């Protein structure tokens, strides 16, 4: 699977897993969260005797009835210093274990570059790890990693890169030097480049073998058009000329430079030692040759349209969505949209989509919603599920109906409380290690967030009410405008796709 297909598959899996796709059986059927549970302990029509004792909760109701004091958590605050060239470094001491974490994050990626750099930018994170350094060929880097128990992490998206290294304190000299070499002096070994290119070519040719990933990729392409968010890796992107060491080095110079970077160090190292090492390695790092041009905002498709990809498969993938309208920031609509999304489909088995599609109707193992937001522009609000071909139209209508229900009727207090508690209490897992705390601060700086963003976010989420959820759903979510994309065997659908809206067939 290609880099973009893999990332989309990961997104798809994350959405589905977040919606509770864990068990194979259906188990006991819990009540829908927006409805009173039916009383199955007495015959129909029989009323409980006056003054009868209330029945104690059983099964899942016992767990849902549990209440805990609200979690109060204050993360340690990293220190911050600058190198002689202005590069910011975050530092957090932690001597509880003989470990040191080194982190570099960069603003940049294929979203900032022309299409002919798409493959080079996509390959960058992988080749920083596998492509060697100017001092060491790839196999020598592998030997160092194994001999000194170094743990190297690389990651990328359309707009960010990360290169992190974890090492035992006693191996810090070796680990730090290798980390700095990977950042400043990558080799981009031609054989490793060709290996990456060959794998991506095969993945691009086989993308249709993965219907779930195909649905997400094609949906993004439909919604975002010729915007980086909608790009799909194609063989024409993967020519040797577009992935040469020279092109990789030129792309590296554009992105991996001080004005795009933030560094971090945490663990068993003093601040003075961290300053010395960082200044020696990065204090004279040459400035960026040019300023990266900010990506243009996407023009997201509006208006009902049904897109169908015919595949001879027993299960359909359904994706629905529209422009989400909400921007990430310290505002009521953003916080209310977080709670609304959790209730709609982000809260696992407690979410309405899972309740309706799985528990009530038995149409799917799971379903999930997403409500994207960025500081610069709106993203997508929508949902995704898989269902058997013969229930495709019914499942699609049920998703849209659940959304319509949420935009016309406020959620219950208990739904909002559960969503709020889940988000707030889950926040602690964003700070399970000093490295995570430092990395969070680095990301906030790259995104120009206020330093107290975390506390603002928690306060904003805690202030959400059922009324504000109803308001944000009513103003920003309209199922009648949703774009629908279905991958499946149309001949086995429980109706024609045209009953949902005007149909366009896609041929990837």
Cite the ranges covered by each PLM segment:
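C-terminal regions of mature proteins
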Residues: 21-71, 262-264, 385, 418-508
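M16/MPP (pitrilysin/insulinase) zinc-metallopeptidase core fold and M16-derived inactive scaffolds
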Residues: 103-166, 231-233, 347-365, 375
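M16/insulysin-pitrilysin zinc metalloprotease superfamily fold
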Residues: 22-24, 130-136, 165-197, 347-348, ...
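An aromatic/glycine/proline-enriched structural segment found at the starts
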Residues: 47, 51-59, 225, 229, ...
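Short acidic/His-enriched helical or mixed secondary-structure segments at domain edges of catalytic enzymes
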Residues: 199-218, 297-316, 355-364, 409-460
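Histidine-acidic residue clusters that define the catalytic metal-binding segment
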Residues: 57-81, 221-261, 293-298, 324-328, ...
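Acidic/histidine-enriched segments that form metal/cofactor-coordinating
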Residues: 25-35, 40-58, 140-251, 297, ...
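Non-catalytic, conformational "gating/processing" segments within enzyme and secreted inhibitor domains
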Residues: 212, 216-217, 221, 245-281, ...
């Amino acid at each position: 699977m290609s880099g973009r297909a893999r990332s989309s598959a990961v997104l798809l899996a994350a959405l589905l897993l977040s919606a509770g796709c864990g068990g194979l059986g259906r188990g006991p059927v819990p009540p829908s969260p927006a409805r009173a549970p039916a009383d199955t302990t007495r015959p129909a029509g029989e009323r409980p005797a006056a003054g009868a004792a209330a029945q104690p909760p059983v099964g899942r109701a016992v767990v849902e009835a549990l209440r805990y004091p609200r979690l109060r958590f204050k993360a340690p605050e990293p220190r911050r210093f600058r190198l002689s060239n202005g590069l910011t470094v975050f530092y957090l001491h932690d001597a509880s274990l003989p470990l040191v974490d080194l982190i570099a994050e960069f603003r940049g990626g294929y979203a900032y570059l022309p299409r002919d750099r798409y493959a080079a930018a996509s390959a960058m994170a992988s080749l920083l790890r596998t492509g060697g350094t100017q001092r060491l060929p790839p196999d020598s880097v592998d030997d160092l990693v194994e001999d000194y128990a170094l743990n190297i992490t690389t990651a990328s998206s359309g707009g960010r890169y990360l290169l992190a290294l974890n090492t035992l304190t006693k191996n810090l000299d070796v680990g730090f030097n290798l980390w700095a070499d990977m950042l400043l002096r990558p080799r981009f070994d031609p054989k490793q480049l060709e290996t990456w290119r060959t794998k991506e070519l095969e993945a691009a040719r086989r993308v249709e073998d993965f219907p779930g990933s195909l649905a997400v990729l094609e949906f993004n392409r439909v919604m975002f058009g010729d915007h980086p968010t909608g790009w799909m890796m194609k063989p024409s992107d993967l020519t040797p000329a577009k992935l040469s060491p020279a092109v990789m080095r030129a792309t590296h110079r554009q992105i991996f430079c001080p004005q795009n970077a933030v560094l971090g160090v945490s663990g068993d190292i003093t601040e003075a030692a961290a300053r010395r090492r960082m200044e020696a390695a990065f204090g004279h790092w040459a400035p960026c040759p040019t300023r990266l041009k900010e990506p243009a905002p996407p023009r997201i498709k509006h208006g009902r349209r049904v897109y169908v990809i015919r595949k001879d498969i027993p299960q359909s993938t359904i994706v629905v969505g529209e422009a989400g309208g909400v921007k990430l920031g310290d505002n009521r609509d953003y916080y209310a949209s977080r709670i609304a999304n959790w209730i709609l489909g982000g809260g696992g088995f407690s979410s309405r989509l899972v309740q309706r599609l799985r528990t009530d109707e038995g149409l799917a193992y799971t379903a999930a919603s997403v409500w994207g937001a960025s500081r610069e522009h709106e993203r997508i609000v929508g949902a995704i599920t898989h269902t058997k071909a013969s229930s495709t139209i019914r499942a699609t209508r049920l998703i849209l109906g659940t959304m319509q229900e949420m935009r016309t009727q406020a959620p219950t207090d208990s739904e909002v409380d559960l969503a709020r508690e889940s988000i707030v209490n889950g926040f602690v897992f964003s700070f399970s290690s000093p490295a995570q705390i430092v990395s969070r601060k680095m990301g906030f700086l790259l995104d120009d967030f206020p330093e107290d963003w975390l506390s603002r976010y928690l306060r904003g989420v805690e202030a959400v009410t059922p009324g504000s959820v109803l308001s944000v759903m009513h103003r920003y979510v309209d199922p009648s405008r949703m774009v629908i994309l279905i991958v499946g065997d149309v001949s086995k659908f429980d109706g024609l796709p045209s009953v949902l809206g005007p149909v366009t067939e896609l041929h990837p």
